[in-house]
From Swiss-Prot:
Transmembrane segments: none annotated. GO terms for biological process: tRNA 5'-leader removal. Keywords: Endonuclease, Hydrolase, Nuclease, RNA-binding, tRNA processing. Its EC number is 3.1.26.5. The keyword Plastid does not apply. RNaseP catalyzes the removal of the 5'-leader sequence from pre-tRNA to produce the mature 5'-terminus. It can also cleave other RNA substrates such as 4.5S RNA. The protein component plays an auxiliary but essential role in vivo by binding to the 5'-leader sequence and broadening the substrate specificity of the ribozyme. InterPro entries: Ribosomal_Su5_D2-typ_SF, Ribsml_uS5_D2-typ_fold_subgr, RNase_P. GO terms for cellular component: ribonuclease P complex. It is an enzyme of class 3 (hydrolase). One of its GO terms (molecular function) is tRNA binding. This is Ribonuclease P protein component.
Length: 119
């Protein structure tokens, strides 16, 4: 479970992150990263904030929940790699349904590396 200080808590935070942030995709996930979350009172103290989007295209409810749990553990383990004021949305793609936790971790890390090169 993500601690509340590391969760995106409302639709405005998701919307701003997806629309204003940078994006990097891999085969199983798309990472939306918004480093300037301090604009418009979006950021609060406590470190980076994460949100997950796992749509019905990924699979049935059991599959979506499993993918969500895997991604939650991946982002919490990587939280120190993100600036404290950043917002991150991880969107799962249909291939995430059959990916292992290690594959998801590798794809999130590769997307983060790509975003770091863009900055």
């Amino acid at each position: 479970m993500l601690p509340s200080q590391h969760k995106l808590s409302n639709s405005e935070q998701f919307r701003a992150t997806i629309r204003k942030g940078k994006r990097a995709g891999r085969s199983t996930v798309v990472l939306h990263f918004y480093a300037e979350a301090t604009a418009g009172n979006l950021a609060t103290a406590g470190g980076p904030r994460f949100g997950l989007v796992v749509s019905k295209a990924v699979g049935n409810a059991v599959t979506r929940h499993r993918v969500s749990r895997q991604l939650r553990h991946v982002v919490i383990a990587m939280k120190d790699q993100f600036p404290a004021s950043s917002h991150v949305v991880v969107r799962a793609l249909p291939p995430a349904a059959t990916a292992s936790s290690e594959e998801l971790r590798a794809d999130v890390q590769a997307a983060l590396d790509k975003l770091n090169r863009k900055r």
